[in-house]
């Protein structure tokens, strides 16, 4: 179980590193924008929103598989289709929100910061379970 957890942690770190890399790209791209005095920060960076969009794409794929699975009952397929419809609406809304955020940043109406994630659970020096096991 610990080996699997470490693999999941490593995969999550790769994903987090990629999100931070994408945010660094956006930060560089919009570095010359004159930020308005009234500009506000968004609660989520563009790359973290894109990360959510990628997770949503996986949910849509798998829900569509269930909604069209021939051997499933009609009730199951109908329930999954209803869920799929919600996921598709979420994708539309999130895509629009990302487009709006990037436009707002480009116009100086919003600004962004890149925060490095500080995960403690996978750090031998910060996680009590890990540093106690080293003794």
Where are these regions (language model features)?
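Anionic, Ser/Thr-rich low-complexity intrinsically disordered regions
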Residues: 1-135
């Amino acid at each position: 179980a610990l080996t699997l957890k470490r693999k999941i942690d490593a995969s999550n770190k790769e994903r987090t590193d990629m999100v931070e890399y994408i945010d660094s790209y956006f930060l560089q791209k919009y570095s010359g924008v004159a930020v308005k005095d009234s500009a506000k920060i968004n609660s989520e960076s563009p790359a973290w929103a894109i990360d959510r969009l990628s997770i949503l794409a996986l949910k849509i794929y798998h829900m569509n598989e269930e909604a069209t699975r021939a051997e499933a009952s009609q009730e199951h397929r109908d329930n999954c289709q209803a869920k799929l419809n919600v996921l598709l609406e979420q994708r539309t809304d999130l895509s629009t929100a990302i487009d709006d955020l990037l436009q707002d940043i480009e116009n100086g109406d919003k600004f962004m910061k890149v925060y490095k994630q500080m995960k403690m659970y996978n750090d031998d020096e910060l996680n009590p379970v890990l540093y106690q096991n080293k003794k």
